[in-house]
Amino acid sequence: MTKVVVCALYKFVSLPHFESIRAPLLAMMEQAEVKGTLLLASEGINGTVAGNQEAIEALLAWLNNQNGLDNIVYKLSFDDEMPFYRTKVKLKNEIVTMGVEGIDPLKVVGTYVKPKDWNALISDPDVILVDTRNDYEVQIGTFKNAINPVTETFREFPEYVKQNLDPVKHKKVAMFCTGGIRCEKSTAYLKEQGFEEVYHLEGGILKYLEEVKQEESLWEGECFVFDNRVAVNHELKKGQYDQCNACRMPITEAEKRSPAYVQGVSCPHCVDKISDEQRKRFVERERQVNLAKARNEAHIGSDVNQVIEARREKKEALRKLAAQKNKLKQTGTV
């Protein structure tokens, strides 16, 4: 069986005319049968895609020929099945959303640490090690002795820093994330807040797992990934977790044996949180998925990323509305 190549990539670079890249990039991906999602913004490009080796090589070559997108940071892993259903190129305000204006990794960023040097750094008792990922990611794996900020989204990270880290008290701070992109912004943010010695794992967890031998590794557990593999082990192969299509939380085989678990409808993490309307919708979606499987067809609507994106768009709309209300209150017009 031909292996599917999964490529996680990003680059912070000034792209003032990023909108014009979308159409030719999407056309190239569709022609090469590359699936997945790439985000474009004025600050760069980010995303994870998959295809056969020839297709991924063609995409990387195409990007390398675009002004500013050469020498892109990417990491490869492999799977037996295609982890994405669709091909998308989206235009965004940020390629990774922190929600703080003026944070620019092109101007200031932390010190990059190679995977081979990471163990020595985080073994230093004077170093504070912070996992910048979301809580559901941390729960299935992290580095030994890492602090979990218990955030639901990356937008919450600045508040965590404000409440828990002090540039006077915490002289050395090391941070890490899945592929490195969130650390670009988190270290830039800490530098802006006056922290002097700020470090981050170059290439992220995925690069560390690729380059550091398991017997020498300080990584514990599996690494959550944002595709249908859910998580990868130290060999960068699909791990032991599945994902609840209702709430996107990773779930174990033991949790799937719980009475709260209904495939495609609920799990122990969300059974008490979803509404009756949502439950009905999830039941119908699962019925459609099973019908599609019986006909040996792909049911696009079963893609959990579609649910995630809808939630993100709803949250963003609510944030904008709240910001508008606050602005009106400050100006005394309400």
Curated annotation (Swiss-Prot):
Catalytic center residues: 177 (cysteine persulfide intermediate)
InterPro entries: Rhodanese-like_dom (IPR001763), Rhodanese-like_dom_sf (IPR036873), TrhO (IPR020936), TRHO_N (IPR040503)
Molecular function in Gene Ontology: oxidoreductase activity, acting on paired donors, with incorporation or reduction of molecular oxygen
Record-linked PROSITE patterns: RHODANESE_3
Domain Rhodanese: 123-217
GO biological process: tRNA modification
Matching HAMAP family: TrhO
Name used for this protein in its record: tRNA uridine(34) hydroxylase
Record organism: Shewanella sp. (strain W3-18-1)
Gene that this polypeptide is encoded by: trhO
